[in-house]
Curated annotation (Swiss-Prot):
Propeptide stretch(es), residue numbers: 61-65
Domain of life of the organism encoding this protein: Eukaryota
InterPro entries according to UniProt: Defensin_beta-like (IPR001855)
Species in which this protein is naturally found: Meleagris gallopavo (Wild turkey)
Protein name: Antimicrobial peptide THP1
Keywords: Antibiotic, Antimicrobial, Defensin, Disulfide bond, Secreted, Signal
Role this protein plays: Bactericidal activity; inhibits S.aureus and E.coli.
UniProt keyword Secreted present: yes
Cellular compartment(s): Secreted
Length: 65
């Protein structure tokens, strides 16, 4: 019975992650439609931030293309 107390927080975390995943997918698709790509925290060299994909991902666009 004690394992239920240990599993309950993990189940809540999984449910919370699943609830916000559809919103992140929409932002990612919007970034890709604008000829951008998602990167973790910062854009690589020769690209600029043009929006956000999720909490820790930014939408980047290359300067050369």
């Amino acid at each position: 019975m004690r394992i239920v107390y240990l599993l309950f927080p993990f189940i809540l975390l999984l449910a919370q992650g699943a609830a916000g995943s559809s919103l992140a997918l929409g932002k990612r698709e919007k970034c890709l439609r604008r000829n951008g790509f998602c990167a973790f925290l910062k854009c690589p060299t020769l690209s600029v931030i043009s929006g956000t994909c999720s909490r820790f991902q930014v939408c980047c666009k290359t300067l050369l293309g």
